[in-house]
């Protein structure tokens, strides 16, 4: 599982011109699910997202998590995080889990996040979405449950 985590002052997502998710201060989280992902991968990424200390404390040091600042999460599925561009010029998405299986894991990931009592908004799985991200910093962290980076 991969996640691109961006610290934001606000973020929103639209489907067919309608806002389906919107947050204030918090994290915009793009989620990619691979063919080999299991519940263990979901829990690993969940724990990283909610405990990453990427918000500044009173000394301007990145020392606070989303839990500490009582921030919000906007979670959006994005299979293109598994685009492999090592060969040729067109991304290969062979490692991305597709369809109902991926949607099931995405929903399970959201359920795990909800256990932390953070306000969570989402995009619409599989939809063509327009995402507005107002980066704070900017601070962008890339997570990978297989620990490739």
Swiss-Prot record:
Subcellular location: Cytoplasm
Keywords: Cytoplasm, Hydrolase, RNA-binding, tRNA-binding
Catalytic reaction list: glycyl-tRNA(Ala) + H2O = tRNA(Ala) + glycine + H(+); a D-aminoacyl-tRNA + H2O = a tRNA + a D-alpha-amino acid + H(+)
Main location: cytoplasm
Cellular compartments per GO CC: cytoplasm
Keyword RNA-binding: yes
UniProt cross-references to InterPro entries, sorted A to Z: Daa-tRNA_deacyls_DTD, DTD-like_sf
Annotated motif Gly-cisPro motif, important for rejection of L-amino acids, positions: 137-138
GO MF term (any one): Ser(Gly)-tRNA(Ala) hydrolase activity
GO biological process terms on file: D-amino acid catabolic process
PANTHER family, per the entry: D-AMINOACYL-TRNA DEACYLASE 1, D-TYROSYL-TRNA TYR DEACYLASE
Similarity comment: family membership: Belongs to the DTD family.
Entry remark concerning the domains of this protein: A Gly-cisPro motif from one monomer fits into the active site of the other monomer to allow specific chiral rejection of L-amino acids.
Quaternary assembly: Homodimer.
Protein's job: An aminoacyl-tRNA editing enzyme that deacylates mischarged D-aminoacyl-tRNAs. Also deacylates mischarged glycyl-tRNA(Ala), protecting cells against glycine mischarging by AlaRS. Acts via tRNA-based rather than protein-based catalysis; rejects L-amino acids rather than detecting D-amino acids in the active site. By recycling D-aminoacyl-tRNA to D-amino acids and free tRNA molecules, this enzyme counteracts the toxicity associated with the formation of D-aminoacyl-tRNA entities in vivo and helps enforce protein L-homochirality.
Protein name: D-aminoacyl-tRNA deacylase
Organism of this sequence: Clostridium botulinum (strain Eklund 17B / Type B)
Gene, per the UniProt record: dtd
């Amino acid at each position: 599982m991969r996640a691109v985590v961006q610290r934001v002052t606000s973020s929103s997502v639209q489907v067919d011109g309608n806002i389906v998710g919107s947050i204030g201060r918090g994290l915009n989280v793009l989620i990619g699910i691979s063919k080999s992902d299991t519940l263990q991968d979901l829990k690993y990424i969940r724990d990283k997202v909610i405990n990453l200390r990427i918000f500044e404390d009173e000394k301007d040091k990145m020392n606070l998590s989303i839990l500490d600042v009582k921030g919000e999460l906007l979670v959006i599925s994005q299979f293109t995080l598994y685009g492999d561009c090592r060969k040729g010029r067109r991304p290969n998405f062979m490692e991305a889990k597709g369809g109902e299986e991926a949607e099931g894991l995405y929903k399970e990931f959201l359920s795990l996040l909800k256990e932390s009592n953070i306000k969570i908004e989402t995009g619409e799985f599989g939809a063509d979405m327009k995402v507005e991200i107002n980066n704070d910093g900017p601070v962008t962290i890339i997570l990978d449950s297989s620990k490739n980076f």
